[in-house]
């Protein structure tokens, strides 16, 4: 059983955090209503777009087949014409929306215009446009009456710096304690025969209760393989029984199969579960739908894992509208209390009272799962580029990072180690949030023993470096692959081997394993689901250990070794990579992502370039990393 003991001074920490939270309510600002709904609509539907081109299953790279990093334009175009939103069109669109502010339109009128724009730009089918607008309009109008964004800033946000400059998310800094940073002290390897624990890691389950075998996997909607997707042409097969290689999520039976088949991968000391429970039908989700997904999957996890403690984190798909996580100063029906209260009720058997307290307020918590280890679960939606509520005030929402500093300082004072779990990886966050988090990790490198995230659906990592030289690797965040097939992937899960539960344990990651369900085999006539280990990290990559320096060295080995990179690329996609080859620009962009635990930091990739040139690294950074 977990120990869940309170840390000394924890009541003081909580009181200080709550006082800062009460002072954080921002003053309202004049808003841009029409622009807001258009922007949120595009961001929401973009969240469900196809990021990988459908492809047939590919053999292992050792069999001589190359694979490719697919460009972002074709899959987005096939989803709903996102490519139609060019920079000039974007600026015309948002200028027109801005002009409408002078008439102070009501919510219904704003929604009507947004639907017409969605249809005109072919962003999605008309029924999807209508449902998405009606779902988002009330919250977005509220946000945009409190915030301000020009057409140039909006298009810079959507299409990148080449289309406009935006700095609405102003720079801010977290205060670190005056306690001097101890000299860096890498953990000592465990003694031979020391206990090793296995931690199950689940992320991005995305249960679709509308999944229906035989339906069209390539429908016009953002999510297919479900009632309403229609039936495929006679020449094309329909959605498989256990899942499908397309823009589809999972039926409940596949998640039951995953949990039921965990035996060979265990036993587990504990489970880290980093969110995204509902499906990608973001245009038609109600609060009842989200709560149904939360309770159904929580009950399923508890049924199959029994007494094993489970520690969840909040994903960006838990809310509706998707990505909509208002900071705690937003009260009433538009707050996230409906969700946090439901999570606290569902997860109460796993979490102590003090963790439930902060979960109810801000969706994050800390606890002690075993002696000498503190677990911190972050609500990474407060760092998200897609969380439109942060347009009101993006400065350390909910005071979460300052609270994190206090938790880490208390752990350092006690001599404890810390694991951090969350959904969105720090390298994918808003710049100021990401840079502050990076600074915090650097300060507490001796205390941090592991960081674990999901969200990207693929198998990767992010390395942290010292801030002075950006050359000494000091931490690594592991980004585990998804359970869902979305998009064009095998279902999967991760198991971490960590230094075991004994006095003096370093609690660091020693190795990890990834397990998948091969859909081609499972969906074959008479096929049954068989979850098998895809690979072990240290064995496959030839790593001496799982420390940050080993992952750093792996990146540069993959830069120079094509075959090693192709192995990584195959595993990155859970054994089902895109069909086209991944050339040098693709390889460098992918490797750059592994070096980039800090957002908008091209200098982190400068050594990937042949001459170490920063301008070349800047061009590399501008490439889409997950397409």
Swiss-Prot record:
Changing residue 388 to R: Retains 10% of wild-type activity. Transmembrane segments: none annotated. Proteolytically processed. Mature lysosomal form arises from C-terminal proteolytic processing of pro-sphingomyelin phosphodiesterase. Keywords: Disulfide bond, Glycoprotein, Glycosidase, Hydrolase, Lipid droplet, Lipid metabolism, Lysosome, Metal-binding, Phosphoprotein, Secreted, Signal, Zinc. Its main location: other. Changing residue 143 to R: Retains 10% of wild-type activity with sphingomyelin as substrate; retains 70% of wild-type activity with bis(p-nitrophenyl) phosphate as substrate. Glycans are attached at residues 84, 173, 333, 393, 518, 611. Residues 1-44 form the signal peptide. The keyword Glycoprotein applies. It is an enzyme of class 3 (hydrolase). Changing residue 283 to N: Retains 10% of wild-type activity. Residues 83-167 form the Saposin B-type domain. Its cofactor is Zn(2+). There are two types of sphingomyelinases: ASM (acid), and NSM (neutral). Monomer. Interacts with SORT1; the interaction is required for SMPD1 targeting to lysosomes. This is Sphingomyelin phosphodiesterase. It comes from Mus musculus (Mouse). The gene is Smpd1.
């Amino acid at each position: 059983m977990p120990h869940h003991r309170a840390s000394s001074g924890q009541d003081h920490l909580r009181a200080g955090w709550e006082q800062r939270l009460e002072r954080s309510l921002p003053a309202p600002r004049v808003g841009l209503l029409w622009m807001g709904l258009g922007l949120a609509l595009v961001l929401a539907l973009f969240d469900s777009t196809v990021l990988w081109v459908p492809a047939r299953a590919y053999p292992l790279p050792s069999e001589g087949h190359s694979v490719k990093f697919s460009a972002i334009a074709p899959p987005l175009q096939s989803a709903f014409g996102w490519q139609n939103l060019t920079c000039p069109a974007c600026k015309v669109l948002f200028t027109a929306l801005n002009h409408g502010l002078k008439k102070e339109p009501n919510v219904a009128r704003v929604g009507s215009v947004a639907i017409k724009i969605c249809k005109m730009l072919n962003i999605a089918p008309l029924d999807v446009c209508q449902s998405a607008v009606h779902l988002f309009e009330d919250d977005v109008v509220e946000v945009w009456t409190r915030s301000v964004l020009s057409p140039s800033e909006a298009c810079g946000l959507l299409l990148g710096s080449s289309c406009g400059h935006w700095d609405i998310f102003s720079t801010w800094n977290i205060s670190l304690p005056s306690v001097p940073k101890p000299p860096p002290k890498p953990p000592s390897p465990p003694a031979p025969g020391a206990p090793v624990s296995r931690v199950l890691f689940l992320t991005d389950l995305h249960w679709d209760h509308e999944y229906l075998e035989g339906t069209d996997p390539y429908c016009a909607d953002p999510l297919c393989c479900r009632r309403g997707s229609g039936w495929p042409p006679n020449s094309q097969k329909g959605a498989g029984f256990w899942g499908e290689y397309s823009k589809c999520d999972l039926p409940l039976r596949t998640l039951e199969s995953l949990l039921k088949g965990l035996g060979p991968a265990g036993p587990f000391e504990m489970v880290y579960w980093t969110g995204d429970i509902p499906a990608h039908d973001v245009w038609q989700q109600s609060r009842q739908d989200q709560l149904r997904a939360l309770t159904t999957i929580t009950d399923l996890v508890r049924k199959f894992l029994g007494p094993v403690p489970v520690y969840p984190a909040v994903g960006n798909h838990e809310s509706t509208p998707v990505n909509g996580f208002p900071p705690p100063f937003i009260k009433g029906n538009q707050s996230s209390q409906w969700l946090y209260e439901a999570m606290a009720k569902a997860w109460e058997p796993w979490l102590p009272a003090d963790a439930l307290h902060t979960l109810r307020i801000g969706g994050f918590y800390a606890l002690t799962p075993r002696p000498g280890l503190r677990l911190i679960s972050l609500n990474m939606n407060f760092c998200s580029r897609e969380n439109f509520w942060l347009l009101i005030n993006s400065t350390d929402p909910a005071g979460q990072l300052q609270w994190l500093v206090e938790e880490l300082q208390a752990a350092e004072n006690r001599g404890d180690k810390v694991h951090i779990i969350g959904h969105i990886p720090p390298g994918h966050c808003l710049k100021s949030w990401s840079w502050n988090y990076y600074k915090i990790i650097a300060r507490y490198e001796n205390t941090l023993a592991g960081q674990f995230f999901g969200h990207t659906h693929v198998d990767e990592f992010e390395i942290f470096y010292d801030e002075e030289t950006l050359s000494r690797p000091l931490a690594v965040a592991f980004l585990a692959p998804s359970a869902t097939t979305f998009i064009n992937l095998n279902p999967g899960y991760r198991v971490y081997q960590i230094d075991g539960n004994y006095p003096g344990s370093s609690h660091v990651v020693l190795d990890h394993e990834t397990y998948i369900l091969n859909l081609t085999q499972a969906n074959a006539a008479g096929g049954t689901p068989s979850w098998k280990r895809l690979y072990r990290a240290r064995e496959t990559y030839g790593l001496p250990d799982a420390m940050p320096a080993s992952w750093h060295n792996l990146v540069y080995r993959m830069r120079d070794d094509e075959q090693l990179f192709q192995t990584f690329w195959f595993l990155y996609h859970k054994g089902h990579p895109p069909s086209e080859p991944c050339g040098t620009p693709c390889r460098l962009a992918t490797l750059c992502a592994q070096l980039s635990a800090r957002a908008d930091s091209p200098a982190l990739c400068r050594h990937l370039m042949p001459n170490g040139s920063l301008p070349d690294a800047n061009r590399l950074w501008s490439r889409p990393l997950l397409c």
